[in-house]
């Protein structure tokens, strides 16, 4: 129903986009046992904490610059095949350090994958460097400093992800100040595992242009109005929210209510194979589960381009492709 529509994705974690087939091949290549995390082509986890553990274990099978080029190229090729014109990938240089590859080689591999994919299909992509809450404020500050000093034109944003229940946003203000001063776009995970207060905290402390998820703002109607008045863009990932039991079903999900309240919303897939989804499915759900028509879905895609962390020339070119 939505296969003909142009698509844009603002919220996808790179390692979280790794297909089970590619991960299995990588595990065989390195002789790594991931049977506790991947069985019969399905990633195995049971709650948010175990999902993060599964994610980290799966990430261990991607070890070299070429591994990351392949992972990135494979996902962007998949996106291009469903009419996607732009993707922002959330990446963690800290992961490159932890596996002994190093942040520079990790990012270099990802950038090579972006170049390969663009050469084939014309898909544009940018990188959002993220700090992980569960590694603590100093680690997050390090990620911000890396992004700020990298001087890489493909690194255009900074994010805070990970275990949302660890610390308040105020603990990470310095990291966002570093990123802001470097001219990076700011987005932050909030209003997913934690309630509306986490969205308010993010607005108060960080003043981000965008919020990853943010859907639980619906629990505070004054906050919803504030989001609408500010023009803050929500990177909404309905399939992820259902998989993580933020909401029991799509009928309960507030995507439509947020949009009708004037909040600027977009559609993304988060960690697609972990949540049995894809960007293609998320767009189809917008039509089938939420009842949006083509024009409404195109409007959300336009919002995503308007909110993308890109230079104005690229933004104009993307808007012209809609």
UniProtKB/Swiss-Prot annotation:
Pfam families from the UniProt entry: A_deaminase
Site-annotated residues for Important for catalytic activity: 213
Record GO biological process: adenine catabolic process; hypoxanthine salvage; nucleotide metabolic process
Keywords: Hydrolase, Metal-binding, Nucleotide metabolism, Zinc
Class of the enzyme per the UniProt entry, highest EC level: hydrolase
Amino-acid positions noted as binding Zn(2+) in the UniProt annotation, renumbered to this chain: 11, 13, 189, 270
EC id: 3.5.4.2
SUPFAM superfamilies assigned to the protein according to its UniProt record, in alphabetical order: Metallo-dependent hydrolases (SSF51556)
Coiled coil: none
Originating species: Rhizobium etli (strain ATCC 51251 / DSM 11541 / JCM 21823 / NBRC 15573 / CFN 42)
Family to which this protein belongs: Belongs to the metallo-dependent hydrolases superfamily. Adenosine and AMP deaminases family. Adenine deaminase type 2 subfamily.
Source species, domain of life: Bacteria
The protein's name in its UniProt record: Adenine deaminase
PANTHER family: ADENINE DEAMINASE
MF-aspect GO terms: adenine deaminase activity; zinc ion binding
Lineage summary: Bacteria, Pseudomonadati, Pseudomonadota, Alphaproteobacteria, Hyphomicrobiales
Cofactor(s) needed: Zn(2+)
HAMAP family referenced in this protein's UniProt entry, alphabetically: Adenine_deaminase
Residue positions of the active site: 192
Cystine bridges: none
Function comment: Catalyzes the hydrolytic deamination of adenine to hypoxanthine. Plays an important role in the purine salvage pathway and in nitrogen catabolism.
């Amino acid at each position: 129903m939505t296969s003909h529509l142009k698509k844009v994705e603002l919220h996808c974690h790179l390692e979280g986009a790794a297909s089970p087939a590619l991960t299995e091949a990588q595990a065989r290549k390195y002789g790594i046992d991931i049977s506790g995390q991947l069985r019969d082509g399905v990633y195995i986890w049971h709650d948010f904490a175990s999902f993060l553990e599964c994610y980290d274990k799966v990430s261990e099978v991607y070890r070299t610059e070429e591994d990351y080029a392949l992972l990135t190229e494979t996902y962007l090729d998949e996106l291009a095949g469903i009419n996607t014109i732009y993707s922002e990938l959330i990446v963690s240089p800290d992961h490159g350090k932890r596996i002994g590859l190093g942040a520079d080689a990790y990012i270099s591999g990802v950038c090579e994958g972006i170049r390969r994919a663009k050469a084939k299909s014309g898909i544009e992509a940018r990188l959002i460097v993220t700090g992980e809450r569960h590694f603590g404020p100093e680690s997050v500050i390090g990620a911000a400093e890396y992004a700020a000093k990298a001087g890489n034109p493909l690194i255009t944003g900074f994010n805070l992800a990970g275990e949302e229940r660890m610390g308040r946003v105020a603990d990470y203000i310095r990291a966002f100040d570093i990123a802001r001063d470097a001219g990076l776009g700011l987005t932050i995970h909030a209003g997913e595992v934690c309630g509306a207060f986490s969205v308010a905290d993010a607005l108060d402390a960080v003043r981000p242009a965008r919020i990853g998820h943010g859907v639980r703002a619906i629990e505070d109607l004054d906050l919803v109005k504030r989001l609408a008045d500010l023009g803050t863009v929500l990177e909404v990932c309905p399939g992820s929210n259902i998989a993580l039991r933020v909401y029991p079903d799509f009928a309960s999900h507030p995507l439509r209510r947020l949009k009708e309240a004037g909040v600027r919303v977009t559609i993304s897939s988060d960690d697609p194979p972990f949540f049995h989804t894809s960007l293609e499915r998320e767009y189809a759900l917008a039509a089938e589960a939420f009842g949006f028509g083509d024009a409404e879905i195109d409007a959300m895609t336009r919002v995503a381009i308007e909110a993308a962390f890109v230079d104005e020339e690229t933004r104009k070119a993307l808007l012209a492709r809609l």
